[in-house]
Amino acid sequence: MKNLFLLLIFCWSGILSGQITDAETQLKNATKTDTVKSWKKGALFNLGFSQVTLTNWAAGGNNSISGNGVANFHLTYKGKKCAWENNLVLGYGILKQNQESIQKTDDNIELTSTYGRKATENWFYSGLINFKSQFTDGFNYPNDSIQISTFLAPGYLLGAAGMNYKFKEFLTLFVSPITSKTTFVLDEKLSNSGAFGVTPDKIIRNEVGGYLRGNFKKEIMKNVKMTSSLGLFSNYIKNPENIDINWDLLILTKVNKFITVTINTNLIYDDDITITSDKNGDGINEVNGPRPQFKEIIGFGFSYKL
């Protein structure tokens, strides 16, 4: 009887052990599946070309060829109490007319990372980092001997802490009362001249202020998607009423699986960047001071989404 009792205990322990092992395995698999589902990644590539060839054209004109490419990568994590969004945008465009040297029409590097902990249903305690720069040298065309910008000249690094409001899946509003904005000018000639608001002979300019950023991303009609990002920064120390503005807008119209039409605009106003212009056409730049900067690119090309 004693041996039978011990045998029953041994069998029952084995059954319980098997059940616990199965439960642990199911829990691990469920946790692993939930973790994988929490991460989302993707990319969008857009490439456009245009060409103009004229032969004995009585009305006149220039032969030209141009190309423009944009790559947009995103990686997001969404948990029960936290969210982490990362976005990298790379853009570059060139233009060649007749015998003139190649000129760039677009040059952009932008990385944005936002992490948030849930406070209420729609509000998150959040931190944001944004970095901007360019790939290659920029020149004061048509004079390609005067360099006016290059990689990390300028470069912008913005760090902010605040609250992020999320409305459904297409609209977010980030508000930060504590923001640090750093401007880098790592090219010696440009920094010595005080370009992009740095003190002459200095390579870094630091600012402290308030920051507001709104993001909108939605299919506004069938096969038409709109993405917009608006950033506003106010320097608490110097001229806080002069708001720095950076507004990006992208409208993407899908013709078929691979063909798209895009409209891309960028509006910038930075109170620390001096713009010179020839007001009376005598070849001398008379006007100096901050000015609105605007860029527009309309393209027809190939698009691929991962």
Cite the ranges covered by each PLM segment.
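Extracellular loop and loop/strand-boundary signature of outer-membrane beta-barrel proteins
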Residues: 55-61, 96-101, 144-149, 197-202, ...
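Repeated loop/turn-to-beta-strand initiation elements of outer-membrane beta-barrel proteins
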Residues: 82-84, 122-125, 170-173, 223-226, ...
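Sec-dependent signal peptide cleavage junction
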Residues: 16-44
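Bacterial Sec-dependent N-terminal signal peptides
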Residues: 1-23
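Outer-membrane beta-barrel "beta-signal"
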Residues: 292-306
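Outer-membrane beta-barrel translocator domains and adjoining extracellular loop/strand segments
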Residues: 54-59, 98-102, 138-144, 185-192, ...
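Residues on the lipid-exposed face of transmembrane beta-strands in outer-membrane beta-barrel proteins
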Residues: 43, 47-49, 69-77, 111-117, ...
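Transmembrane beta-strands of outer-membrane beta-barrel pores
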Residues: 47-53, 79-81, 90-96, 131-137, ...
